[in-house]
Structure formats: structure tokens, C-alpha cells
């Protein structure tokens, strides 16, 4: 089972820096995270960023070197040279119940700007390889939704 623990956005959408801790968290043991805000507050930016980051995991489950969606250039915060999405997940092994953390970072630099951050997708690839191995051994294996 895979649980998304944190999502960090830097210079993306309207956020200079945003850390979102998804349920469950220490204070609240609920399994539900709710985003509430006025129009234009950034709820859609958060969800699109989550989908963009997870698209790399899904693509690498399908094929070893698969490519997911890129951060759109127009999503980079005005006046900034780059934007990043960092995702941290916790994957629990079905047989051993051992929980392993994984983290990956997706970066986008604006055209004509110097790159300051690079994407780091090694752990997304490792997690995808784990699920490909599980599926190879058992075609009825479960995948995270």
C-alpha cells in the first residue's frame, strides 16, 4: 500500500513555497485530506501538481524509463526562474508490512533562464520497479490507485 505523505511546491502557481502534509498526520488520524479555499486560492494548482508528480510514477510502472507530464512553463511563479514539485510517499510491503519512504522531485526551468534545480526521479523509478516486480511474480498483484 502506498500513502502520499507530503507534497511540497516551490515557485509553482501562486505559491512561493507550500508544504502540504496529507492525512493521516500526528494531530489527526483521519484518512481524508480536504482542500478548502476561495476561488483562485490554489486548490487546483495543488491537485494538478500532485497529478503531474504521480504521472512519473505511473509512466515508470508501465515502462522502466517512462516519462510523465512536465510542469507547464506557465505554472512557474511570475518572476521566478524555475519551479519544483516534491512528493514523499510511504510504501508498505504487502508481505512484510515494512514501510519504506520514497521521495522524488520534478523541476522545470523557464525558457531562457539558467537551471538551478534538476529533477530527481530515482526513487520514483525504484518504487515503480517494486510494483513491476510484484506484478511479474503475481499478475493479480495490487497497484496503488
Q: What residue ranges belong to the model's regions?
A:
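Pre-Walker A-like glycine/lysine-rich segment at the N-terminus of P-loop NTPase domains
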Residues: 1-51
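Intrinsically disordered, low-complexity boundary segments flanking structured domains
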Residues: 4-9, 43, 71-75, 126-140
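Short linear motifs at secondary-structure transitions and domain/linker junctions
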Residues: 9-12, 30, 58-65, 115-134
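Glutamate identity and glutamate-enriched acidic tracts
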Residues: 16-17, 27, 64, 73-74, ...
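Glycine-rich phosphate-binding loops of NTPases
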Residues: 95-145
